[in-house]
């Protein structure tokens, strides 16, 4: 496998830390050891997160092409758009963000706090659009790019989750390589890796990266899209493409992609009671914050799998914390009493 053939523009502090979740592990019976790899604190750019790792492999292309404006898309509380705005500010580029109405939720300040607030503070041109949730290419995003061209700019397109970009999976191949090095330092290997999946490239990169040492099926995706067929197909497609890019040496098959669909309900962006319990439990036991859209659902999935005995006793499980805590502000009513 050859990831080093691709240029990387450093936007993170370096390898994200791995920390034990000792109190959560004990609370759940102590038979499974839980750890977290902290992508939520991987960068000094507006709280970082998993998209910042992905952008390290996209930005060299933007610079090489002489682009002056990063154009991206997401929901109103998109973590991706916040991270794109931060990177644009850091590089001295302009930023246009399309924020669609992906979530059927209306807190009084939903479109004024959290991720979207930070994007505005960082100087992004934020455009609200009424279109609903979809993980594909969107007309509103294409129009934003044509607007930049009409105004004499040169846009660089960054799709939702970076996932439709040819290099969208590379960052999390690097994640797997980091984990292998950290395992040498820790003196053990993780039996399972748990990760949230929606647009697909995070899990796709992990599948490829861990396929290099035979652990692709140990990457357990927790669907948060509530459109699992579309998400799984996208993970598989991106993983196959990424495997070719990094010269993995074998084909990625459907069996390599594990996606648990039990925890996404009722729909994208809306937490269920298990999501909220997981957010409160992890927060109160570990001081680690997760959000109602993504990480709260993957944390719920991991907690329930431990409770149900789905991880063999003695397993060491690595939770990929992808970030997203700024979105908590947009769900303040749900946590008005803690």
From Swiss-Prot:
Keywords: Genetically modified food, Hydrolase, Pyridoxal phosphate. GO terms for biological process: 1-aminocyclopropane-1-carboxylate metabolic process; amine catabolic process. The keyword Zinc does not apply. The keyword Mitochondrion does not apply. One of its GO terms (molecular function) is pyridoxal phosphate binding. Introduced by genetic manipulation and expressed in improved ripening tomato by Monsanto. ACC is the immediate precursor of the phytohormone ethylene which is involved in the control of ripening. ACC deaminase reduces ethylene biosynthesis and thus extends the shelf life of fruits and vegetables. The active site is at 78 (nucleophile). Coiled coil: none annotated. Its EC number is 3.5.99.7. The modification N6-(pyridoxal phosphate)lysine is found at residue 51. It catalyses: 1-aminocyclopropane-1-carboxylate + H2O = 2-oxobutanoate + NH4(+). CDD domains: ACCD. Its cofactor is pyridoxal 5'-phosphate. Belongs to the ACC deaminase/D-cysteine desulfhydrase family. Homotrimer. Catalyzes a cyclopropane ring-opening reaction, the irreversible conversion of 1-aminocyclopropane-1-carboxylate (ACC) to ammonia and alpha-ketobutyrate. Allows growth on ACC as a nitrogen source. This is 1-aminocyclopropane-1-carboxylate deaminase. It comes from Pseudomonas sp. (strain 6G5).
């Amino acid at each position: 496998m050859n990831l080093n053939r691709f240029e990387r523009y450093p936007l993170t502090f370096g390898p994200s830390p791995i920390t034990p979740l000792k109190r959560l592990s004990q609370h759940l019976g102590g038979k499974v050891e839980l750890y977290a790899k902290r992508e939520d604190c991987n960068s000094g750019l507006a709280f970082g997160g998993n998209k910042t790792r992905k952008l390290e492999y996209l930005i060299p292309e933007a610079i090489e092409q002489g682009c002056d404006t990063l154009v991206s898309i997401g929901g109103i509380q998109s973590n991706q758009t916040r991270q794109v705005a931060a990177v644009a500010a850091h590089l001295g580029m302009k930023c246009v963000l399309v924020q669609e109405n992906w979530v059927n939720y209306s807190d009084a300040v939903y479109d004024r706090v959290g991720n979207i607030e930070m994007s505005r503070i960082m100087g992004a041109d934020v455009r609200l659009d009424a279109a609903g949730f979809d993980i594909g290419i969107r007309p509103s995003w294409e129009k934003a790019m044509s607007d930049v061209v009409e105004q004499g700019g040169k846009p660089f397109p960054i799709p939702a989750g970076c996932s439709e970009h040819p290099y969208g999976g590379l960052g999390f191949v690097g994640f797997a390589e980091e984990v292998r090095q950290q395992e040498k330092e820790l003196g053990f290997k993780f039996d399972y890796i748990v990760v949230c999946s929606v647009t697909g490239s995070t899990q796709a990169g992990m599948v490829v990266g861990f396929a290099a040492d035979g652990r692709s099926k140990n990457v357990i995706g927790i669907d948060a899209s509530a459109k699992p067929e579309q998400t799984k197909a996208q993970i598989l497609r991106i993983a196959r493409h990424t495997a070719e890019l990094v010269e993995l040496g074998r084909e990625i098959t459907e069996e390599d992609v594990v996606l648990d669909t039990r925890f996404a309900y009722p729909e994208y962006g809306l937490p269920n009671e298990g999501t909220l319990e997981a957010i409160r439990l992890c927060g109160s036991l570990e001081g680690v914050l997760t959000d109602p859209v993504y990480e709260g659902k993957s944390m719920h999935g991991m907690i329930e799998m431990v409770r149900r005995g789905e991880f063999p006793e003695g397993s060491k499980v690595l939770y990929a914390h992808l970030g997203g805590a700024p979105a908590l502000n947009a769900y303040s009513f749900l946590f008005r009493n803690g």
